[in-house]
């Protein structure tokens, strides 16, 4: 028989940098999960990924206080900022431009994010990523 699920916790945790400090500690502590055990398992699972990369993580907590977790690909904005070389998007998207990004770069990002996107093909995924780039105040150019 499968374990009874008590709940899900969604967090964005930096790869290889899980610590029992907020926001991880309080979120897991409320559910009675062993915080240090999660930190050890998460850091071991993400040691191959560049340290500090934000990873959306879904933690499934069971009735016996055990847990499992699934990490997803980093947010599209993380990839976009890295590709363009900026720290943040435009404060006023649509008015002030934060830079430019090539459509080929968007396609690469879409390829990396494909499994987490609600898209059937690479063209649809590229359009989703393009929307994120435009929302950050970037101008999309051909190339």
UniProtKB/Swiss-Prot annotation:
All disulfide bonds of the chain are: none
Q: How is it modified after translation?
A: One or more lysine residues are methylated.
Which Gene3D superfamilies did the record assign? Answer: Ribosomal protein L11, C-terminal domain (1.10.10.250), Ribosomal protein L11/L12, N-terminal domain (3.30.1550.10)
Domain of life, source organism: Bacteria
GO BP annotations listed: translation
Q: Does the keyword rRNA-binding apply?
A: yes
Named from the GO MF annotations, one term is: structural constituent of ribosome
Is-annotated flag, keyword rRNA-binding?
yes
What do the Gene Ontology cellular component annotations say?
Answer: cytosolic large ribosomal subunit
Looking up HAMAP family in the UniProt record yields: Ribosomal_uL11
Q: Give the record's subunit note.
A: Part of the ribosomal stalk of the 50S ribosomal subunit. Interacts with L10 and the large rRNA to form the base of the stalk. L10 forms an elongated spine to which L12 dimers bind in a sequential fashion forming a multimeric L10(L12)X complex.
Sequence similarity: Belongs to the universal ribosomal protein uL11 family.
- Protein's recorded name: Large ribosomal subunit protein uL11
Say which species the protein is native to. Answer: Novosphingobium aromaticivorans (strain ATCC 700278 / DSM 12444 / CCUG 56034 / CIP 105152 / NBRC 16084 / F199)
Taxonomy of the source species: Bacteria, Pseudomonadati, Pseudomonadota, Alphaproteobacteria, Sphingomonadales
